[in-house]
Regions:
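Alpha-helical transmembrane segments and immediately membrane-proximal extracytoplasmic
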Residues: 1-275
Length: 275
């Protein structure tokens, strides 16, 4: 990762090494709960949208991704226009969203812009992934979690002005820490890899100030998401495609290629187009 993109962090957090951990040990609890609920809704929506898209058989195979791309473009354009109405035009729905995340880390986004980006990104990802468009779920999940954390941060900053909780901490520090916790918690809830999100966030930010709150928030989100949706996302996607990993033959080392029937991995719904 660093050999390709360089040693500089992708996202600048600038929390400082003297950040107080104790208040964030409390904040990570509701953050983890909120991330679990949002992640559960996101996974359910993704599976439902994909199920609907697979049921659409009246359209040619190559037309559905095109319509999905058109819909994503419309959602991204609306998000850009609506965030611009608040003086902060953001194109985070179109791109990976590092610029918008960086602005959220620096307390540079109003809550309306973050709410628009969160909702717009969720809708765009559901449409794009369900219709067979390009792209994955890792970066969008981090982006959505960052916007969730940013909304938390604005609320915490407002509370801190009335009842000081964070000593010697600026609004930018509160926002940066909240965005960081939100990214990790939602990733753990959706992808079900709580420690992988720690590594990804550390690699992207080069900041290790909130290790314990991140771990606790991730584990809370991971546990609650598992209770709400026992089948992980990628397992559920395989089940939608008719692949059940539990029914595959047991691993037999070097003999696997001889004993594994082709029918366990082949697809019967072949899409063919005229050359």
């Amino acid at each position: 990762y660093r050999m390709i993109l360089g040693e500089d962090p992708v996202l600048q957090v600038n929390l400082g090494r003297d950040v107080a951990t104790a208040p964030w040990m409390l904040v990570c609890v509701p953050m983890g709960i909120a991330a679990a609920l949002l992640g559960h809704g996101f996974v359910r929506g993704l599976l439902a949208t994909r199920r609907w898209a697979k049921a659409v058989t009246a359209l040619p195979a190559g037309l559905l991704p095109g319509l999905g791309g058109l819909a994503c473009g419309l959602v991204g354009t609306l998000a850009y226009v609506w965030t611009g109405a608040f003086g902060q035009p953001e194109h985070g729905v179109f791109s990976i969203g590092y610029e918008s995340l960086g602005a959220a880390f620096d307390a540079g986004l109003v809550w309306q812009a973050m709410a628009i980006l969160l909702v717009g990104k969720v809708i765009a990802v559901l449409i794009c992934y369900a219709t067979g468009g390009s792209g994955g779920l890792f970066s969008p999940t981090l982006f959505i979690g960052g916007m969730l954390g940013g909304l938390f941060g604005i609320g915490l900053a407002g509370v801190d002005t009335l009842l000081p909780i964070f000593r010697d901490t600026t609004t930018a520090h509160i926002m940066g820490a909240s965005v960081l916790l939100g990214m990790g918690a939602l990733f753990a809830a959706v992808i079900r890899c709580p420690f992988t999100s720690l590594v990804i966030i550390f690699e992207m930010t080069r900041d290790y100030s909130l290790i314990l709150p991140l771990m606790i928030g991730n584990m809370i989100a991971y546990y609650l998401a598992g209770r709400l949706q026992p089948v992980p996302l990628y397992n559920a996607l395989l089940l939608q495609d008719g692949i059940n990993l539990r029914r595959m033959p047991a691993y037999q080392g070097a003999r696997d290629y001889r004993n594994l029937p082709v029918s366990t991995i082949m697809t019967y719904d072949v899409v063919a187009v005229d050359a």
